[in-house]
């Protein structure tokens, strides 16, 4: 199979879809890999690094899409890429369709096979291709939250861990999954007072056992969230419903309950956001203020640490990429039910129910 790795063109997206080590594995199995020139530069990989493992370098993104049977990316295609995607071409990347109707319609029109990293799901309901980026995003959410609590950034001017004799910052984390757990670990390590919420009591019991003692757990309800808001300094939204839009856990009216300079970090923004007042921002303009509350809603948080996140992503995606390349998408998905759940839009049909339901589109079960 011919695999193409284009350069990401989303604002400040510095990751690349495959490391040289991943390319080497595919080449060893007899496949041909084309990489766009400088695609890996911001992740620390030069064109020479790819050439050394027998990748072919192409100058333009158009060339990569034109030649490849399968495209391996990081983020969803954006408008300039829509017309480049070919009928029957496999596109393996994060899509987050439920947050973007135009993207969904464009992929339907393309007749491509769109396999979304974020909905590949194992029998135990774990999300193996979302987990590594969730780990990065959770840790980054705390880092950026701490930065925007600084007064020059519009925050309250609080140090996360305080100092002897001065109370530390209070952090509320909505969602106790991979993102929330990693955010809590980082915040606790910085010395903050941390409260993490979830609706799953079994998960809360687990978190109580494994997280540091300065992390408390709370059942997630509207009442409980409202009770916490007047005293928090940083809120991290990390709620996930696989493949579906995130619920709004904090409304605009609830912003009035918080003190000016409180920071909201919406990690769920790529699934529509879990704050009513959230809209996507970029690394170049990451924040905005609504009713005195600082909002950070960058949709590609891990793109700020591309070396770490690219390595982690390829570690997770490579076995699936190899299976798709060696077997073809139909056989690979037939052999692996987890991978089959990644099929979101296939040859003009919406094949993931949550996406179809969000947009009122027809859902068609895929036959393998």
Tell where the protein language model's regions lie, with residue ranges.
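Rossmann-like adenosine-cofactor binding region
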Residues: 209-291
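Glycine-rich phosphate/diphosphate-binding loop of Rossmann-like nucleotide-binding domains
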Residues: 6-7, 11-45, 152-240, 287
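Short glycine-/small-residue-rich Rossmann-like dinucleotide-binding loops
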Residues: 69, 75-76, 95-96, 221, ...
């Amino acid at each position: 199979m011919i695999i193409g790795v284009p350069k990401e063109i989303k604002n400040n997206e510095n990751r690349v879809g495959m490391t040289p080590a991943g390319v080497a594995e595919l080449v060893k199995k007899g496949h041909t890999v084309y990489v766009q020139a400088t695609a890996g530069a911001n992740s620390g990989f030069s064109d020479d690094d790819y050439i050394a493992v027998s990748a072919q370098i192409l100058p333009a993104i158009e060339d990569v899409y034109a030649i490849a049977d399968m495209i391996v990316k990081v983020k969803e295609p954006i408008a300039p890429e829509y017309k480049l995607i070919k009928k029957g071409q496999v596109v393996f990347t994060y899509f987050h369709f439920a947050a973007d109707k135009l993207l969904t319609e464009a992929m339907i029109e393309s007749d491509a096979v769109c396999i979304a990293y974020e909905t590949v799901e194992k029998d135990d309901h774990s999300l193996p291709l979302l987990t590594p980026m969730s780990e990065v995003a959770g840790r980054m959410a705390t880092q950026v939250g701490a930065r925007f609590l600084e007064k020059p950034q519009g925050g309250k001017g609080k140090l996360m861990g305080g100092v002897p004799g001065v109370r530390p910052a209070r952090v509320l984390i909505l969602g106790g999954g991979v993102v929330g757990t990693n955010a809590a670990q980082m915040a606790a390590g910085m010395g903050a007072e941390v409260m993490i919420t979830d609706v799953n009591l079994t998960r809360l019991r687990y978190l109580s056992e494994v997280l540091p003692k300065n992390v408390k757990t709370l059942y997630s309800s509207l009442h409980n969230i409202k009770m916490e808001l007047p005293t928090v300094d940083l809120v991290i939204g990390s709620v996930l419903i696989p493949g579906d839009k995130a619920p709004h856990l904090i409304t605009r009216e609830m912003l009035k309950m918080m003190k000016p300079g409180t920071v909201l970090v919406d990690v769920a923004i790529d699934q529509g956001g879990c704050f009513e007042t959230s809209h996507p921002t970029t690394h170049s303009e990451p924040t905005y203020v609504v009713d005195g509350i600082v909002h950070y809603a960058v949709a590609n948080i891990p793109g700020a640490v591309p070396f770490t996140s690219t390595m982690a992503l390829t570690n997770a995606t490579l076995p699936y990429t190899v299976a798709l390349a060696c077997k073809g998408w139909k056989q690979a998905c037939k052999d692996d039910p987890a991978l089959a759940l990644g099929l979101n839009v296939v040859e003009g049909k919406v094949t993931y129910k949550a996406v179809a339901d969000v947009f009122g589109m027809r859902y068609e079960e895929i036959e393998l």
